[in-house]
From Swiss-Prot:
<dbReference type="Pfam" id="PF03879">
    <property type="entry name" value="Cgr1"/>
</dbReference>
<comment type="similarity">
    <text>Belongs to the CGR1 family.</text>
</comment>
<comment type="function">
    <text>Involved in nucleolar integrity and required for processing of the pre-rRNA for the 60S ribosome subunit.</text>
</comment>
<dbReference type="GO" id="GO:0006364">
    <property type="term" value="P:rRNA processing"/>
</dbReference>
<keyword id="KW-0690">Ribosome biogenesis</keyword>
<dbReference type="InterPro" id="IPR005579">
    <property type="entry name" value="Cgr1-like"/>
</dbReference>
<keyword id="KW-0698">rRNA processing</keyword>
<keyword id="KW-0539">Nucleus</keyword>
<feature type="coiled-coil region">
    <location>
        <begin position="47"/>
        <end position="105"/>
    </location>
</feature>
<protein>
    <recommendedName>
        <fullName>rRNA-processing protein CGR1</fullName>
    </recommendedName>
</protein>
<dbReference type="GO" id="GO:0005730">
    <property type="term" value="C:nucleolus"/>
</dbReference>
<keyword id="KW-0175">Coiled coil</keyword>
Amino acid sequence: MSEQEEVQLPKLGKAPQVRVNGKNWKETKTPFRTSSLSVPLKHRSWERRQKERENLRMIKAKEKEMKDEKEAEHAEKVRRIKERRMAKEEKERLEKMTAILSAKKLARRKRKEKRNKLLRERN
């Protein structure tokens, strides 16, 4: 072959890009074009989006309020249960104390009666 002959390659519209990661079988992504969107998605006005965002904020605020209310009710229920248990424990403690005190009182009376009986028998 002579040096003057040039090899002509077919002209392609665009040279294919070689992927760095080697995943050449995957489809190459194209930039997002809004002109290809459907009409309802393309013509969403700023005011409409703002209104939707505001509605979403209101819904979330209402959900949070309901959740907080439910949590407060639960906390109140737990507090009442704890108070009831504490009152019951206090009542049981007082009953034990009165039982112990009355037992001591009974013992004192028995000793006193025993003394009186002994004194009566002597006389």
